[in-house]
Amino acid sequence: MAERLGLGIIPGVGWRAKDIQAIAREAEDAGFDGIFAAEVNNDVMATAQLIGAATRRVAVGTWIANIYLRHPYVCAQGAALIADAMEGRFILGLGVSHPPVNKALGVDMGDPPAALRRYVTAVRSWLKGEGPATHLPQRPTPQPVPIYVAAVTSRTVELAGELADGFMPFLWSAARVEQSKAWLQRGRAKAKGLGKVDISVGIPTYVGDDVKQQREVARGNLAVFTGFPFFQRLFRASGFGPEVDQMERGAGGAALSDRLLDAVCLLGPLSRCREQLAAFRAAGTDLPILMPSVDVDGARALIKAFRR
């Protein structure tokens, strides 16, 4: 099977609907196999619809849909309709987002892994036509809707192995991807009727001849994540304790050491990026999702660099 490659976009400030669709078409024409949209300053389900309408071949996914923002019934019915319109190309990525995000929206997260378990179970039940009846009988979705789950801790990775078709880590090193396979297998041992877990890793990607310059670009783009407790926990578990100490003191992007960036990103000349990508694949990544700089031009440059 040919190696797959995905593009991740963050259609926040500066993106218009026409930009989302233009980038989607360009990525499809360049040979990418999937296009995934983050839920940042947008409705990710609506964004997926835009991408699906602009493309014909690629998989289209949410990366990820925040479970606290939609009732599972609404999520399932929306996913079913999108998958039907795309004739089975849709991937429903689900996750709990982050405490600072949900707090700003007035959301009480409770126990996130438990909430994620209930949500995935409910969504899958409605997709099968087995959810609680409303005023009309339920029916199975006409197209399959694979469910992928975002994961940070070993507990959520194991949950993904038990309940999901795939899992979507972000800011993981290749070494942690390798480590995660045992956690996935523990979860899969409890699963019923599910095939192999598809490991789709989101990898920030910054292509340019000057490695130092690209690291600075990465620091600027990724600084916001240093204030998220879940990512701080991830980085500490991945062997970056001193960096996390700086993050907890509010250092922002300055806390992202060269060593950390080189572990979780592809950056530098294209040849170096390809070598780093090969390491992620060797560790078990089935579908790398390359995340460019947040603006439209960054997405366009990445598409051009990785054209196949």
Q: What name fits each language-model region?
A:
Residues 1-308:
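Active-site-adjacent structural elements that line small-molecule/cofactor binding pockets in enzymes
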